[in-house]
Amino acid sequence: MEQIKRHLRSAAGYLAVCAKWLVLAALVGCVVGPLGGAFGLALNWANATRGAYPWLLYLLPVAGLVIVFLYHRFDPDGGGSTNQIFVSVREHKPLTLRTAPLIFVSTVATHLFGGSSGREGAALLLGGSVSGQLGRALRLENRDCRLMTMCGMAGAFSAIFGTPLAATIFTLEVVDVGSMQYAALLPCLVSALLGVFISGKMGLAPEAFVLQAEAAPTPDNLVRVIILGALLSALSIFFCELLHVTPKLYRKFFPNIYLRVATGGVLIIALTKLLGTTDYNGAGTAVIEAAIDGEAVPCAFLLKMLFTALTLGAGFKGGEIVPIFFTGATFGCVAAPLLGLPPQLGAALGMVALFCGCTNSPLASICLAIEVFGGQCVSLFALACAVSYMLSSYFSLYREQHFLHSKLRIVGVQRVHGHWSETDAAHLTTNDDGEN
């Protein structure tokens, strides 16, 4: 009888915790869903408005000055970096509430006036800051505020991109690579599902494509996909390093933050006029769609990386993920025919596998492929992501991303003097290039 009572008490405890997080996760989803939807609609408006009024590009340096002033005045320590949310989750420290309006306004301004940036990284900050402060307002413990922050990240990511499964797994996977907090699975998924439902009701359509060309997983095609995955891993390393080096160069030559951002705006204007196209301003979703349809300019991936690095490095705001999609899709579209793969499939593989290499989130990348491309060629997507993940070493888009396990052996890794090293004494190696 006592054993039965213990089991009943245990079951009651599980049910109570489950009910608690269903309610809290639903609350987060109902809060960040409208925010994410409004953010996505505002960015769509910004890009459409810039297309209708090309002269707005000439105001980009002025917009940069306003953005820098706002951050210098209201968030001098944060700076609007996605790395903030990683620290918040790892150290159980909710972001300040002012993070949300700052990243919202500054990202919309960057897109409106022609900067090259994305939106998902900004959405992580938007949702994470609001939900973390919601946890504080409810007087939750620090560890529960951490989970609330993760729910907000998943909910906002899902709301703006329309991929609840990828948003959930990405939130669990990306902060500490190799350690997924499965206790957060249900709450994050609930927030993500509600987030995408609400944003859909607001009129924000989810990202979805239909592949016009497929390939069977034959041995020949598997080899081709492995080669493409290896090329994308190299491209991910280059892109990550470019995004890390560019701010250092800006700081070296332009120590004044206002001169720095104004210079970045002028450079974007000059490059846009030199090229005679606005394809590389804003998010560039039209170019992504064209690449998945099999059309891409051979040098488009290089130019998008350059525009994005110049924009974000100067101090403009926004995410990096959509530019990664742009870069991967255009590169894959161009490279795939050289390997004997359809350009449409190559663009899709490039989009997902480059995302994997830059963010070190293979499971989320596979989920992204399933949701965005409807499960077509899922085995090829998984293979490309696996190769890109392994060969991208310990480079990362995010400096605050930590690695817990080796990518090459079943051993742990630790950071020693800024480099990730295997902890197995028998195979102790130091990656001199994998500094984050």
Positions of predicted regions on the chain:
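Alpha-helical transmembrane segments and immediately membrane-proximal extracytoplasmic
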Residues: 1-436
